[in-house]
Amino acid sequence: MNIVVLAGGRSAERQVSWVTGKACKRALEDLGHRVKVIDPDEDLPLRLWQERQAGCDFVWIALHGPGGEDGVVQGMLDWLGLPYQGSGPLASALAMDKLVSKQIFRAAGIPTPDWQVWDDQNPLTWADCAAELGSPLVIKPSNNGSTVGISIVRDERSFAQGLELARSVSSRIFLERYVPGKEITLSILSGQVLPAIEIIPAQGDFYDYEAKYAPGGSRHLIPCSLSPAGLARCEAAGLKAYQALGCEGLARVDLRVDPEENPWVLEVNTLPGMTPTSLCPDAAAALGWTFTELVERMLQDALQKAQLTGSRHPQSSSATLGNAP
């Protein structure tokens, strides 16, 4: 097949996206496909239409963060009739917005830590938040990934610094109760829950950007140290979160598990990283899958879905851009 890989983009996760894109490009080429990489810009709709006219069969999205993981590109590809891997526009948009996700989790009975919204019309103080959520607490921008803009705060000074950091990347911020315990992540491929991974940062208890992407920044424990009953609760909560948002293909659910082994869903990532230090490839490896085999399964899953729905197959679409050259 002729495959276009979208990598780079303009979000704060651009560099991670490039690493993901290069790894997926190699895997797709190893599978015998002809692969072209495009770095999205404002001309992306026209470029994709041109690629479709030139015989593009599939688009592999290797973007992370706003502009790639939030449903914008997915909606564009649906309109053009080009199949792609992963979740559709709605699930992508819901998962990208952590506040909306948490509201859906709460409505669906999925345990998620308590939170409060901070904005200019509701400028909560440290005392307000600590009284409601306890200390420490977590400050998060609503719509960024890779822990960009996230901080754990323990006093008024770090609270002010955390707000400044979060506001530098997003206008929508919330404060979340910190759950002590273990960091667990679940990779889910079309409803199949892969082996859970317990994340142990090399320094401290915070799985930040450096811990995620720097070699040696964290240790991935497979199998995790949860009891069978605790693991079952964790898997059930993760799968329910995946389904509540309407996810498809590969997604990763991040959770905290408290000392009583109660799971608390933090967020769902619909385009999880596929770098040498990423979690999903490690979970797949625990099943004996190579990186290339994981990519092949994701590709076949997407193609099967496109054939079943007819909504993401280039031959079935009459989408045009008027008289575009």
Curated annotation (Swiss-Prot):
It catalyses: 2 D-alanine + ATP = D-alanyl-D-alanine + ADP + phosphate + H(+). Pathway: Cell wall biogenesis; peptidoglycan biosynthesis. It is found in: Cytoplasm. It comes from Synechococcus sp. (strain JA-2-3B'a(2-13)). Gene3D superfamilies: 3.40.50.20, ATP-grasp fold, A domain (3.30.1490.20), ATP-grasp fold, B domain (3.30.470.20). Mg(2+) 1 binds at residues 254, 267. InterPro entries: ATP-grasp, ATP_grasp_subdomain_1, D-Ala_lig_Van_CS, D_ala_D_ala, Dala_Dala_lig_C, Dala_Dala_lig_N, PreATP-grasp_dom_sf. Residues 102-300 form the ATP-grasp domain. Keywords: ATP-binding, Cell shape, Cell wall biogenesis/degradation, Cytoplasm, Ligase, Magnesium, Manganese, Metal-binding, Nucleotide-binding, Peptidoglycan synthesis. Binds 2 magnesium or manganese ions per subunit. GO terms for cellular component: cytoplasm. ATP binds at residues 130-185. GO terms for biological process: cell wall organization; peptidoglycan biosynthetic process; regulation of cell shape. This is D-alanine--D-alanine ligase. Its cofactor is Mg(2+); Mn(2+). Disulfide bonds: none annotated. Mg(2+) 2 binds at residues 267, 269. Its EC number is 6.3.2.4. Its main location: cytoplasm. One of its GO terms (molecular function) is ATP binding. PANTHER family: D-ALANINE--D-ALANINE LIGASE, D-ALANINE--D-ALANINE LIGASE B. It is an enzyme of class 6 (ligase). Pfam families: Dala_Dala_lig_C, Dala_Dala_lig_N. Cell wall formation.
